Amino acid sequence: MSVSSKTSHYDPFRGESSREIALECVVATFIAIAWCNSIELVVLCFTTFKRYGGCYFWSLVIASISIIPFALGYALLIFKIFPSYFSVALEVVGWWGMVTGQSMVLWSRLHLVVHSRRILRWTLIMIIVDAILFHVPASVLEFGAHSNHQDQFNPAFDIFERVQLVAFSVQEIVLSVIYAWAAVEMLKLMPRGQYKGILIHLLVINFVMISMDAVVVGMQYAGFFRLHVSLKAMFYSVKLKMEYAILGRLVHVAAVPVHPLSSYTPTDRSSSVSRI
């Protein structure tokens, strides 16, 4: 169902119930937090990294910047400030960059703990194929849902919107699970007690990220549309901020030699760090 049909009851010039006003305040708060986090993330990208290059850096930059048009587009639509194709285009472009950018961030950091070229290649193919299969049809359906023929597009868009959300959530979960598995394997190579706290912390962060995806999907299927889209923007900004906590610890662990019998040498680790 299109945003316009889901929010047709909203009139900023009419008195609203206390519950409705509270809901709109919550939505506005989530969007504001997402914007603040996005600006902070962009600043961190250009002040934290010594070298402006590499897949990890540019994925972080694109994903961070994309939160702004995504949240802005939906704010214009939800509050009927400027319900037009321009607003739809803003949130569609932002959604592409935010979601696929986040997946590319997750994929890029796999290089620090995953050393199988086959796994890295197939996970990258998964991201590319999913982007084509889900972003393109969803974008076409969404523009159609805001056209003069919205009755023809609304049913298909309502279904596909949920399908793509689940698909991208599963994609991020797959990347997080692969990372968690590889991190545990690395943990087994460490001397007993050494760096366990760091790796456990990384696993907890990944669990929190997966939980955020589950909450977003649940809100979508429960029908809380406005809360869902605003919470989605905020959660993606929070997940990207958590990446900075992961980055420092991953580089620290991956650059340190492990058990002397391990076939993965410190030199290999240094090259993995430089590749992200």
Q: Can you annotate each of these PLM segments?
A:
Residues 106-113, 142-147, 245-257:
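A cytosolic-side transmembrane-helix exit/cap motif
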Residues 67-81, 133-149, 177-183, 208-227:
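Helix-to-loop junction signature of class
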Residues 1-2, 251-276:
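Intrinsically disordered, low-complexity terminal tails of fungal membrane proteins
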Residues 110, 114, 118-180:
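Membrane-proximal helix-loop-helix units in multi-pass membrane proteins
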Residues 24-34, 84-99, 138-139, 155-175, ...:
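Extracellular loop 3-seventh transmembrane helix
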Residues 184-193, 253-254:
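Juxtamembrane membrane-water interface segments of multi-pass membrane proteins
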Residues 1-122, 126-131:
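Membrane-proximal first intracellular loop
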Residues 22, 193-196, 270-271:
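Anionic, Ser/Thr-rich low-complexity intrinsically disordered regions
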